Amino acid sequence: VTGKHEWSHYEELNEDGFYDYRNLHLNYYAVKALQARVYLWEGSAASKEKALAAATEVIDDYFTNTATANTIVRWMGDTDFNNYPAMALEHIFGLNINSDKFSNLTASYLKTAIADTDYDAYYMTNDDTYAIYENSNTDYRFTKLLQSQLNGTRVGFLPLKLHQTDGAQQLYSNRIPLLRMPEMYYIAAECHLANDDVEAALDLLTVVRNQRGVYDE
């Protein structure tokens, strides 16, 4: 919306706060993102063309690489992961959850440290982790969103992405994503690949990789 009007245009209209946190709303671009997902799942050549068009519209019109005061959706930066572990800045559509209920439901699974008796806790072995994250020195998902687990018999890493910490930026805490910006890049890349446009597909994947701190050597 702010692509058509200055933010000041909405100040009077926004007295009730409706336009706040629009990346939680099922707004126009969230619908286009959902279209892209559904068309790709359908899988026919015609639907993949529609999926590509919808995903590209979201990427080109709704996304920005520059952080401004009124930015709706943008890439996570290096320093953002500490405040927004669920990557809220990249959400196109999501849920605002009750943190107490969520913590109670996930207490057995999402932990920052585990003992041998924490049988339900989610953790990743060292081998699995290093196989997934090809560059553990620079990949933000590795350096920012995993906690090393060195005690007990289950040595590995614990995921922090959905763990709500006291240090998280409160305006963007307690959020669970349903549609995120990187998915639009993946959908568009898959559609380009279906059209044998490997270069376009790789360009899109490279954008996501670079934004995660993964670079081609």
Regions found by a protein language model. Name each.
Residues Y119-D127:
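N-terminal segment of the mature soluble domain
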Residues V1-Y109, A115, A131-E217:
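Acidic/polar-rich alpha-helix caps and helix-coil junctions
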